[in-house]
Curated annotation (Swiss-Prot):
One of its GO terms (molecular function) is L-leucine binding. Coiled coil: none annotated. Its main location: nucleus. The keyword RNA-binding does not apply. May function as a negative feedback regulator of TOR function. Belongs to the sestrin family. Disruption phenotype: RNAi-mediated knockdown results in decreased lifespan. It comes from the Eukaryota. GO terms for cellular component: cytoplasm; nucleus. The lineage of its organism: Eukaryota, Metazoa, Ecdysozoa, Nematoda, Chromadorea. This is Sestrin homolog. Keywords: Cytoplasm, Nucleus. Pfam families: PA26. It comes from Caenorhabditis elegans.
């Protein structure tokens, strides 16, 4: 009887209204025609390309990925597409209603979105197919897993774009949606469910709260004190919810498949008991799990990712064998977005145009290569990707503190941005602002693919090492 009541209540989520914001997204990218072609081609190709993944499963994966950043617009869009492609309605009740392989993939979804440097080859070993060509209900084929990771990483990046340019739905919200958006806000839950949470007196602001307050000061033109950002340490995470967040072994010794069953953390504890009682459908477990500054990571045995040792060419060659068309599209998109603009007005200190030389070159125009390179390398540095031959001191000379704050929020906490923060880049034109946002989104996308593909190579090497052929990279 209890199960029937729960199922009837959850079925209300099937009666949603499609939100048109996603269709409006590519109208903004039209300000850069060539980029628009690459974006629409790459994003659309992920859902129509020939692959082992059924069409409905692709949209369900995107729904799982969008839920990590609580992007309601994308979630509504992929719910509708999932049903249009013949997906099972019961799956929309939550990830626990889907196949086992999607529940196991949820762990990888969390890592790709928030801490990709933690992806290990043993996380992939329990996902690959054993006997059936398509992987069956419990495993993925190599091709389908590559495709699934591409969809999830691209969706994470699209959440950044949608939230930054103000297309995220923040009106006509139900109470459950409001609870979902504030799942990690201790003050909100203290006021709403005081009986379930203890009050934390005089707690220090979390890193997200600090970044948002700094961004507000930038918009108001206030002078910011030279305060040091508080790191998202374990103590800070504990201030978000009543119980401490799940910990992850710095020795990386425990990679049991049970960790991939979503509702159990590495310590064998029930994640659901640590989260607020939110009734919104769960498409990805451990919803309070989030980004931690790479420099403050507890996993000190994980070194920075060196591009000189494993660059985009390695990623391309590894995945091109299985997803050649998709990989080629991504290669062209990454190459184009990094060279999108050639010049910018010196008065505004940012880029303009679509890579085409202006009719009359102004003597005050300067090259934007340093600006674009600083944005790209700073964003990827947030996810542990380092370029040895780049002078990172240039970032502080090229990007002011307000711009770096906006980039960090956009890349790591896009769900914390609202429409009022779209004015965080004063003096930027719409096309220029979109260019910056797209660079941030694609830089984090590529960083996720770096870490994932290196784990794939380590997995392949370990399989061969059993025959004495080679050793893993790590």
């Amino acid at each position: 009887m209890h199960t029937t009541t729960k199922r009837r209540k959850a079925m209300d989520w099937l009666n949603f209204d499609p939100i048109p914001e996603v269709d409006r997204l590519f109208r903004f990218t039209c300000k850069h025609p060539t980029l628009h072609v690459h974006m629409t081609g790459s994003y659309g190709h992920m859902f129509v390309d020939i692959s082992d993944l059924p069409a409905s499963a692709r949209h369900y994966l995107a729904l799982m990925a969008a839920s990590r950043h609580r992007c309601l617009s994308l979630m509504d869009h992929h719910r509708r597409k999932f049903l249009e492609k013949g997906g099972q309605q019961m799956w929309l009740l939550g990830i626990d209603w889907s196949y086992m392989k999607f529940r196991k993939l949820d762990y990888l979804n969390r890592m790709l979105c928030h801490r990709p440097w933690m992806i290990h080859w043993k996380n992939l070993a329990v996902l690959f197919a054993r006997r059936t060509p398509d992987g069956g209900p419990a495993f993925f084929s190599v091709c389908s897993l590559h495709h699934a990771v591409g969809i999830m990483s691209m969706t994470h990046a699209m959440c950044t774009v949608i939230c930054c340019i103000g297309l995220e739905r923040r009106v006509d919200l139900t109470q459950d949606e409001i609870d979902f958006l504030n799942i990690d806000d201790l003050d909100y839950w203290e006021a709403r469910m005081s009986a379930y949470f203890r009050k934390v007196p005089d707690r220090r602001p979390t890193e997200v709260e600090y970044l948002i307050s700094e961004l507000k000061k930038t918009e108001k033109g206030q002078t910011r004190p030279p305060a040091k950002m508080c790191a998202m340490t374990t103590e800070t995470i504990e201030s978000l919810i009543s119980a401490p967040a799940a910990t992850y072994s710095s020795n990386r010794k425990n990679y049991s498949p049970v960790l991939l069953l979503a509702n159990i953390d590495e310590n064998g504890e029930d994640i659901m008991e640590k989260e607020p009682p939110c009734n919104y459908p769960i498409y990805s477990h451990h919803r309070t799990f989030g980004y931690i500054d790479f420099r403050k990571r507890p996993e000190k045995d994980i070194p920075p990712f060196r591009v000189e040792e494993f660059g985009w060419d390695h990623v391309y060659n590894t995945m091109n064998e299985y997803t050649d068309t998709l990989t080629s599209r991504l290669d062209r998109m990454f190459d184009h977005i990094r060279t999108l603009t050639g010049n910018m007005p010196s008065g505004s200190s940012h880029a303009s145009g679509d890579g085409e030389p202006p009719a009359a070159v102004n003597q005050n125009e300067i090259d934007t290569a340093a600006f674009r390179e600083a944005i790209w390398n700073y964003t990827q540095g947030l996810y542990g990707v380092r370029v040895d031959d780049y002078d990172y001191s240039k970032i502080n000379r090229v990007l002011d503190k307000g711009t770096k704050t906006f980039i960090k929020l956009a890349a790591c906490y896009p769900h914390k941005l609202t429409t009022e923060f779209t004015r965080a880049l004063p003096g930027f034109k719409d096309s220029e602002k979109i260019h910056v946002v797209m660079m941030v989104a694609m830089a984090r996308f590529q960083a996720s693919m770096f870490h994932y593909t290196r784990a794939v190579c380590n997995y392949n090497a370990m399989c061969l090492s059993k025959k004495g052929w080679r050793k893993p990279l790590d």
